[in-house]
Amino acid sequence: MPNLLEKTRKITSILQRSVDSLDAELPYNTMAAQLADIIDCNACIINGGGNLLGYAMKYKTNTDRVEEFFETKQFPDYYVKSASRVYDTEANLSVDNDLSIFPVETKENFQDGITTIAPIYGGGMRLGTFIIWRNDKEFSDDDLILVEIASTVVGIQLLNLQTENLEENIRKQTAVTMAINTLSYSEMKAVAAILGELDGLEGRLTASVIADRIGITRSVIVNALRKLESAGIIESRSLGMKGTYLKVINEGIFDKLKEYN
């Protein structure tokens, strides 16, 4: 059976792995599963707004309401507010505690249910909450040491990912600004007309039809599309006589066009 040191190493090794994107449906599912396996419990990670970032049900809890939290990916406001007022780990909470993840109506079924809640911090900010629970076994001191380490690791990962996402957003905004600045007035007019033709972020268009409608030459549209594609704003593919397939990669172009209109 792994000892405390081995379990600690397993948790810290999570830092060597990456989370793809906070935009993913449940970006921390894998991490929650790893932590649940190491600590031997059920686990979930929520952000400051109560949105579920990931969870793992190693042991069946058999409560419809808890499972509904996971299906909707959102915890109740009253629970999130209570959890946000936990500044240090609250360990081995009974089913009678307001912070117990076991609903009131299931107390009789899980009289020995235990919940532990740990705040997640990163960069001096409260980023979320790490919640673990068992149906019938208290968390030992060794378990609680692992919980402290786990919440720190999650905080570092969450902060790093937020930083990466921020840098990516800045890069995209810069690319859009630079692309827009290379467009002539006619090309800007063409881009606005082209994007207005799309059904959401992608679609098929015919350059000559758009050119005739807004009173510019087809070459202006072609040049505008080339500039946007070289800047990584769009992807395009010729469909021959059917026109051109267009897909917007950098959605910031829509907001930037509004500024110029």
Swiss-Prot record:
Pfam families on file: CodY, HTH_CodY
UniProt keyword terms in alphabetical order: Cytoplasm, DNA-binding, Repressor, Transcription, Transcription regulation
Predominant cellular place of this UniProt entry's protein: cytoplasm
GO molecular function, a single term: DNA binding
Region listing for GAF domain, in residue ranges: 1-159
Keyword Transcription regulation: yes
Domain of life: Bacteria
GO biological process, one term: negative regulation of DNA-templated transcription
Residue spans binding DNA: 207-226
Location(s), subcellular: Cytoplasm
Matching Gene3D superfamilies: 3.30.450.40, Winged helix-like DNA-binding domain superfamily/Winged helix DNA-binding domain
GO CC entries: cytoplasm
Family indicated by similarity: Belongs to the CodY family.
The protein's role, per its UniProt record: DNA-binding global transcriptional regulator which is involved in the adaptive response to starvation and acts by directly or indirectly controlling the expression of numerous genes in response to nutrient availability. During rapid exponential growth, CodY is highly active and represses genes whose products allow adaptation to nutrient depletion.
Identification of the protein by name: Global transcriptional regulator CodY
Taxonomic path: Bacteria, Bacillati, Bacillota, Bacilli, Lactobacillales
Gene it is expressed from: codY
